[in-house]
From Swiss-Prot:
Keywords: ATP-binding, Glutamine amidotransferase, Ligase, Magnesium, Metal-binding, Nucleotide-binding, Pyrimidine biosynthesis. Residues 564-585 are annotated as: Disordered. It holds the Pfam family CTP_synth_N. Residues 306-554 form the Glutamine amidotransferase type-1 domain. Belongs to the CTP synthase family. This is CTP synthase.
Length: 585
């Protein structure tokens, strides 16, 4: 009889998180919260998301379908769950943290074209699954500082039973076989619905979901039971029996007051203790010092400020997930609750619309985006905030709209961006030189923007330098357009200052009005929201929310709302809107 393979106890452990019954159960937040708990126990944790869609990355996907694109330090366009991972682990992840079917197939087909398979018939098993395994196991390699992770948490996207997810689940099963069962843990998230007519919680969907998982060779080690209420012990015992899972591994996770409470929910159910015990991990007790302070700020704010987020994708809040989280974190720094008002940018196109939408807020945020739809509304919101002394922060496209509004205020009435109006006589926002082929349709759109971390130099004593408490910073970017340097002097006549540039001075990275002109009107070409953490809020958001708090506590000027146009005038406006619709996209 052959000897059994031995696996070192010091090996990196792999923990897979799967989901069943329905999507949107919160696998990403569950995985992130468990990662936070293990980190608080002194373990080195890294995370990865396996996405079963055929897109190479989400960079060209519709925000209404996918939500935001989260950009990593190394310039990868990744799933929004990677943002959750970074915020809960409080560490930067690389592009390898997100694997898609499109990436896997592209790599395998490229290898086949190079002849690396030596004439083999290329198949899903073993070639696709081997490539998935390679990417999962690579996460266990030492980082740039030479630190090898104790635990790799891998979230498998999709729902058990989906055709698209099968290769990833098979690869996960094979990883368990290769690294050893004692070094691998499967956590399955399932729904326990409450049937109001009968007043009962139903376990059958979970039983069927686990049966589907077991049919492909995976026995879960623990179950996350998602419900709108606590699952009683009697039902937990029933599920443990029917799904062949230890009772200690059946975890009730009722809806939490906030996402920051989820680690406490999991810890109360002793999931983290069960995981470290099953994986034979060295650990210490959870250090709650930092997280308890966060929860105190979340649940016991001293005041509330209202921030208007003026965007074009507000029907799906996930399209601005990192922005919303950065705003809330900025509030935590001031012991303030940030109440986000989701304002469709089209509502602010007119002075009447902007005054109506923004009259009762303490600050305005203009997020990034693409395309012409809603641009005039963003410009209108900026004009209103500038004239009212209302704190405003513009991100990426938000900076570009600030520049357009400033240019129009000094007589360049047709100033616009080459993105929205290629024929504008005053393109104050122009296409970056290395992006012209992509914009012209002569190069790929996906993965070709100015992506990832880039440095910037800030003017001494500027608002942004004071916010950062530094004159050299690095932020993540995702854009193809830039401020046209030919218009800098003319735009400066408005009072707008170019307070931060690339180190060579050629690319505008930050703009602002001086403090004696406006209390806080700042724009950045970057996406600082991507580096904000709940326990370490981004300084730019801290400064912005701080300005909103001061505005809220100050004496407001009366709002002069322009008269509402007559019915005839409104009708004509509607006709013009219909005429513009095809061009606006």
């Amino acid at each position: 009889m052959p000897a059994l393979r031995k696996h070192p106890h010091t090996a990196t452990k792999h923990l897979f998180v799967t989901g069943g019954v329905v999507s949107s159960l919160g696998k990403g937040l569950t995985a992130s919260s468990l990662g936070q708990l293990l980190t608080a126990r002194g373990l080195q944790v890294t995370m990865q998301k396996l996405d079963p869609y055929l897109n190479v990355d989400p960079g060209t996907m519709n925000p209404f379908q996918h939500g935001e694109v989260f950009v990593t330090e190394d310039g990868a366009e990744t799933d929004l769950d990677v943002g959750h991972y970074e915020r809960f682990l409080d560490r930067n992840l690389s592009g390898s943290a997100n694997v898609t079917t499109g990436q896997v197939y592209s790599t395998v087909i490229a290898k086949e074209r190079r002849g690396e398979y030596l004439g083999d018939t290329v198949q899903v098993i073993p070639h696709i699954t081997d490539e998935i395994k390679r990417r999962v196991l690579e996460m266990a390699e030492p980082d740039e500082d030479g630190n090898r992770p104790d635990v790799v948490i891998t979230e498998v996207g999709g729902t058990v039973g989906d055709i698209e997810s099968l290769p990833f689940l098979e690869a996960a099963r094979q990883v368990r076989h290769e690294v050893g069962r004692e070094n691998c843990f499967f956590l399955h998230c399932s729904l326990v619905p409450f049937m109001a007519p009968s007043g009962e919680l139903k376990t059958k969907p979970t039983q069927h979901s686990v049966a589907a998982l077991r049919s492909i060779g995976i026995q879960p080690d623990a179950l996350i039971l998602r419900c709108d209420r606590d699952v009683p012990e009697s039902l937990k015992n029933k599920i443990a029996l029917m799904c062949d899972v230890d009772i200690d591994g059946v975890i009730s996770t009722p809806d939490a007051p906030s996402i920051y409470d989820i680690p406490k929910v999991l810890h109360r159910e002793e999931l983290d203790a069960y995981v470290v015990r099953r994986l034979n991990l060295a650990f210490r007790d959870v250090d709650w010092t930092q997280w308890n302070d966060l929860l105190h700020r979340v649940h016991e704010p001293r005041e509330t400020v209202r921030i208007a987020l003026v965007g074009k994708y507000i029907d799906l809040s996930d399209a601005y997930l990192s922005v919303a989280e950065a705003l809330r974190a900025g509030g935590f720094a001031h012991h303030a609750k940030v109440e986000i008002r989701w304002i469709p940018s089209d509502d602010c196109e007119t002075d009447v619309g902007a005054a109506t939408a923004l009259s009762d807020v303490d600050g305005v945020l203009i997020p990034g985006g693409f395309g012409i739809r809603g641009i005039e509304g963003k410009v209108g919101a900026i004009r209103y905030a500038r004239k009212r002394g209302l704190p405003l922060l513009g991100l990426c496209l938000g900076l570009q709209c600030i520049v357009i509004e400033a240019a129009r205020s000094v007589g360049l009435t047709e100033a616009s961006s080459a993105e929205f109006d290629p024929d504008t006589p005053d393109p104050v926002i122009s296409t970056m030189a290395d992006q012209r082929d992509a914009v012209a349709g002569e190069a790929d759109l996906g993965g070709t923007m100015r992506l990832g971390a880039y440095p910037a130099v800030l003017q001494k004593n500027s608002l942004v330098a004071k916010a950062y408490d530094a004159t050299e910073v690095s932020e993540r970017h995702r854009h193809r357009y830039e401020v046209n340097n030919a218009y800098r002097e003319r735009i400066a006549e408005s009072g707008l200052q170019f307070s931060g540039t690339s180190p060579d001075g050629q690319l505008v990275e930050f703009v602002e009005y001086p403090a004696d002109v406006h209390p806080f009107l700042v724009g950045t070409q970057a996406h600082p929201e991507l580096k904000s953490r709940p326990t370490r809020p981004h300084p730019l958001f801290v400064a912005f929310v701080g300005a909103a708090v001061e505005y809220n506590n100050g004496e407001r000027l009366p709002v002069d709302i322009p008269a509402i146009p007559t019915a005839d005038h409104q009708s004509n406006g509607a006709e013009h809107a219909l005429e513009d619709a095809p061009a606006r996209g």
